[in-house]
Amino acid sequence: MRNVDAAGLGIGDDYPPRLMGVLNVSSESPYKPSVFDEPDEAAAYVDGMIEEGADIVDVGLESANKRYEVLTAKEELERLDVALETIASVSGDAVFSIETRYHEVADEAISRGFDMVNDISGFADPEMPRVCADHDVAVGKMASPPDLERPGAVDDVDWSVRRSPAWAEQASYVDNVYESLRLNGFTDKTILDPAFGGWSERKTLEDDRETFRRLREFRGFGRPLLVSINRKNFLREVAGRDTDGALPVSLAATAMAVERGAHVVRTHDVAETRDAALIGKEFARRRVRDPGDVSVEELDVTTAAEARRHLDRLDADPAAADGAVTRVFEFEGLAPEDREALVAAAADTGAVVAPAETGALLAGSPAALRDVAASAAGSEALAAALERLPVGDAY
């Protein structure tokens, strides 16, 4: 996993989770507590976030809400002075990020005091990577189509043209997000954002929930991950909460996101989110990381789909993913002949069966378990149980 240096702030597996507080100088922003148009008031708000634990402050010049017309680069530049006056008045120490989709705005902001860029259009402006690389700054890249006016709308891309009809037919929403992050490449200091939130009319809350379930897959890029999940609808709906009551679900999801590999959490609730992120980091899996002459890193892989993402990055055979993960299942209520059938079926597959008095423990790779299911010569009840094993591509 590549670490990123953002103006001296380390981001990645070797560092604590980083908190990105939010300041908006756009009156259109839907979250009014973070909106300021007076630099002194804005600076006081930012100092408060820094005291609460914000490592990064993300400054938005316009609302990303799809209900509003997109500002031009010229209009964003007209709002930049307020943002610059604000950061000049801040007494606390933080990395300042400018949220923009335009390379002209990024160039001006970095030249005049900002430390990094947060591009919600995913390098739809083809000059954005060059500007960020020339300034040697970190840049957040959100999954997005190559369209400056439709950030995050990855399900609006015609993937049958961009990839192939066959690929598009079998691809899931998460596959679309993953492919969108590939578009237009990366800089050496790119941080990836899988675009949680209502970025298009076609996107569903379940799309976001599935992306969250499969968050570890995005570690396959080998780059730090940024998540923006604070009080989002896909979490609120689970618990039946409105925005004001959504802090507890946001904190629960924050701990889970960090445990699953997120490195930066964007939030309006800095103090509370800091604690949740630290809990997630504390209970994340401890993995081998040895940077010797021949480096060794244990990957955080729990499914074949996650393994396949890493194999893709390495340009290695994706078929190896089927043997990269072990699944363990307990069977109960097996007749003696079914226990014997399991043992016999597993003998030549690489799976392991540990028979017990009325059941058995079955362990193996998804490929081995599929072979067991195909060859076991037991009862109809055993065949039905084996057929229900979740050992397809997503597992």
Say what each PLM segment does.
Residues 353-395:
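C-terminal functional modules
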Residues 1-26, 285-322, 341, 387-395:
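N-terminal amphipathic alpha-helix/helix-capping segment at the start of soluble metabolic enzymes
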Residues 55-58, 97, 116-118, 140-141, ...:
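Conserved beta-strand positions in the central sheet of alpha/beta enzyme cores
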Residues 23, 49, 53, 117, ...:
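Conserved, mostly hydrophobic/aromatic
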Residues 18, 31-32, 36-38, 44, ...:
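Active-site-adjacent loop and "lid" segments of alpha/beta metabolic enzymes
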Residues 319-335:
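Short glycine-/aliphatic-rich beta-strand segments at the starts of folded cytosolic domains
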Residues 179-206, 311-323:
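Active-site rim beta-loop-alpha module in soluble metabolic enzymes
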Residues 40-57, 89, 93, 107-116, ...:
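Alpha/beta enzyme core
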